[in-house]
Amino acid sequence: MPSFRPHTPSLVRPGGRARSAGQGESAPVSAAISDCAVYENGSRLSGEFAPAAALQQVREVETGSGKAFVWVALHEPDEGQMQSIADVFGLHHLAVEDAVHAHQRPKLERYDTMLFLVLKTMKYVKDDPAGGSREIVETGEIMIFVGADFVVTVGHGEHSDLAAVRRRLEAAPASLELGPYAVMHTIADHIVDSYLDVTDLIETDIDAMEEEIFSTQAKTDIESIYQLKREVVELRRAVAPLATELQRISGEHDDLVDVEIRRYMRDVLDHTIKASERIASYDELLSSLVEAATGKVAMQQNVDMRKISAWVAIAAAPTALAGIYGMNFENMPGLDWAYAYPTVLVVMAVICLLLYRTFRRNDWL
């Protein structure tokens, strides 16, 4: 399901600059930055900032009476680019390795005064004409580093862009005034809402499959059911662990997360549990549909075998008579009788007709 960059051995070490094995100099960090902005008292400051300059601007604002933080968004950075960001914001090297290599389960980790949250993204792509793949749902990952005055987001996959979330927040200065953890909440809320959207579309697919299976006319495609079940299992692995991690945010870390943000996170937790329960029910329903489809196919095969057997029996009678009278013997009953040939043909036809009527009466034909 996921379509991330291949994993390369990590050379990130505390205090050292990262480099991929077999790789030369890293690309400039600006190549991986989708957006970098400073927010002061709920409003975005004009101008473009490099991460270090943005953090310096925030610290200058904080020495006064204002509240500010920086939000840096990265997309699939390499180890060198990620280490440059880690040097600026003081990110823990273990979290940095996770952010570079992706393929992480949803989790929440605390490093001193910083939280590191991993979320799975989902996008329903079954009816996307440009997709070109057989996937029903594509997944990606978003890693969120949250400190007292910064947010660093790292996206992996085609559907990890947070531009819409940033615009939503910038249109609500009151939310941005709550600080970096408000950004974490809004991102989590956006992603969990997408889970519910995906489950709605999957439910439509399951309803269509259910109608197809129990229809007497439609042909049952077991492969498509297996494919959807495989996708649902992937979704279950992506969503189920998240509820526990969100519960930790809403119930722990009160020294870092404002009480108002923790209230909002409880709402996100409720939606996550709802999505997880839906996906679990879909998994069970698809298991039942697989059994029903298998039974339907087996029953259809039995019907086909009965038809084949009936026609074989009908063909066997004239074949047997023809075989007997086709033997090269001189002394056989009826060889000299003038009406022997038409009589044998009539007997063949009568036997075939009787067999046909018998099989029709027993619903074999």
Spell out what each predicted region is.
Residues S250-R262, L286-V297:
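Long amphipathic alpha-helical coiled-coil segments
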Residues P2, D270-L365:
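Hydrophobic alpha-helical transmembrane segments and their immediately adjacent juxtamembrane loops
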Residues M1-D258, Y264-D267, H271-S281, G334, ...:
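Peripheral, non-transmembrane regulatory/ligand-interaction domains of membrane transport proteins
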